[in-house]
């Protein structure tokens, strides 16, 4: 059976990174999307590759449509297909609960 090809948006930290780690060790190829967390995503890539996963990185600001549109074609070309898209990207801003 051929490796599953997965894209995870917002995968450098928190939930996205946890999702990627949960797939480590399975027969998968993963494209990790990130925007500002380059250091974190490179560390994650190394971790996943140590489990035998093939990993690709793409930086894109999803608030800019032209950058967002590049993710799927990039992943499709690198992984030679796409089986699953996990839309996890978000904006996370720490703030005091009383400010909501």
Where are the predicted features?
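Conserved glycine-rich Rossmann-like NAD(P)H-binding loop of the short-chain dehydrogenase/reductase
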Residues: 26-43
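The beta1-alpha1 cofactor-binding region of Rossmann-like NAD(H)/NADP(H)-dependent oxidoreductases
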Residues: 38-39, 59-71
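Conserved mid-core segment of classical short-chain dehydrogenase/reductases
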Residues: 69, 92-100
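NAD(P)H-binding Rossmann-fold N-terminus in SDR/SDR-like oxidoreductases
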Residues: 14, 18, 92
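Aromatic pocket-lining residues of Rossmann-like dinucleotide-binding sites
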Residues: 23
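Rossmann-fold scaffold of SDR-type NAD(P)-dependent oxidoreductases
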Residues: 9, 82-89
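Rossmann-fold cofactor-recognition segment
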Residues: 48-64
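Conserved glycine-rich cofactor-binding loop
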Residues: 5, 12-14
